Design a protein with these regions (language model features):
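Thiamine diphosphate
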Residues: 1-125, 129-227, 232-236, 284, ...
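A short, acidic, amphipathic alpha-helical segment used as a generic capping/interface helix at domain edges
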Residues: 8, 144-145, 308-320
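Active-site regions of oxyanion-processing enzymes, predominantly non-cytosolic
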Residues: 151-156, 323-329
């Protein structure tokens, strides 16, 4: 029988009853409350990407534990390599709990989830992961039993099955992300701009839509690499609008940019130390000096803005010099209410952008 709004506390206790833990992963909105519950218990290890999460889990298995990896199905691609060349090869066991975005039975989901949602079951089977849809706490026993004979098994979680668990947030930073984007949009108006997935793209679209804006709604962590590819083919200034969670997911892109040194690239990271679109779960940016990372990766200059006045001045300084340059903008966690969705299809975004660059 399908359980609706399963309590995070009961789910956690059932997992612990069978000896599961530790818990690691990448935040997901489908069961975002469970991540927050684990954070409050200090039982969650945030990973920058899903492959890293599975590797952490594998290491804990080698130390005698029964690890759990939490993720969204969009991140399955990131863990295919450690699943096929580590877990399967070395007979290392892990339980995956996967938020199922784009389930064909949920046709109203966002377009970036449609293909992966349709192929999730087939993809798991293809890489030898037996799966089951989580419908009740009894399915934890199923997972435990199946792990006796399998290296990795997965429980798929549909929206609404696990209850929402709200997080209390506080911040000492002055700006909201929306306020920072208003300043950035004004100073970079008419320039080529690449904006990262989720709320950064939606807010930029609302503040200053432009035919030279390229909004991505998926491909988390790849925006700076996409921008690099364009910057190397154009002479005009290219602006990257990134987020801390996305930047951390594929941090190696900074080293590539620093090595290639495109003079026309300015990389801006709007850092709220959380995953805004999935429930404000913590990233690891609070203990990572991203501005220094960029500088040590070979960026020409790197600055940090904590206030509106600093953002105005430091952004202008970096716009006036050759790059690649990096600007870290610390902002409050949270989202502006009722920000509209991008009304262009992904294909329309591509065609409009390419025509603008001709």
């Amino acid at each position: 029988m399908l359980t609706i709004n399963m309590k995070s506390e009961l789910l956690y206790k059932e997992l612990k009853k069978y000896g599961f833990g530790p818990f690691t992963g990448v935040a997901d909105s489908v069961f975002g409350g469970f991540f927050i519950y684990l954070e409050e218990l200090n039982e969650y290890i945030p990973a920058a990407n899903e492959g890293l999460a599975l590797s952490i889990a594998s290491g804990s298995y080698l130390a005698g534990k029964k690890p759990v990896v939490l993720l969204q199905n969009a991140g399955i691609g990131n863990l295919i390599n450690p699943q096929t060349s580590l877990n399967d090869l070395y007979k290392i066991k892990s339980l995956l709990m996967i938020g199922w975005r784009g389930n064909p039975n949920n046709p109203k989901d966002a377009p970036e989830h449609w293909l992966m949602g349709e192929k999730t079951l087939d993809l798991l089977k293809l890489i030898s992961i037996e799966s089951k849809i989580l419908e009740s706490l009894d399915d934890i026993k199923w997972a435990n039993d199946k792990l006796q004979d399998n290296n990795t098994v997965a429980l798929l979680i549909n929206p609404g099955v696990i209850e929402t668990y709200n997080k209390n947030i506080s911040s000492n930073y002055e700006m909201t992300r929306y306020e920072a984007l208003e300043i950035i949009a004004k100073k970079t108006k008419g320039m080529i701009r690449f904006s990262t997935t989720a709320m950064v793209s939606r807010e930029l679209y609302e503040i200053d839509d432009s035919i030279k804006n390229f909004y991505i709604i998926g491909s988390m962590g790849h925006i700076s690499a996409i921008a690099l590819g364009t910057a190397l083919q154009k002479n005009e200034k290219v602006i990257v609008l990134d987020g801390d969670g996305a930047l951390l997911m594929h941090l190696g892109a900074l080293s590539t940019i620093g090595n290639i040194k495109p003079k026309n690239l300015l990389h801006i990271c709007l850092d709220n130390e959380s995953y805004s679109s999935t429930g404000l779960q913590n990233t690891t940016s609070s203990t990572t000096h991203l501005d220094k990372v960029a500088l040590n990766c070979g960026y020409k200059d790197s600055k940090t803005a904590l206030t509106k006045n600093e953002l105005e001045n430091k952004l202008q300084e970096l716009l006036n010099i050759n790059g690649p340059n990096f600007l870290l903008v610390k902002v409050k966690p949270g989202n502006r209410d009722n920000v509209k969705r991008i009304e262009l299809s992904p294909e329309e975004i591509t065609k409009r952008f390419m025509n603008a660059l001709k």
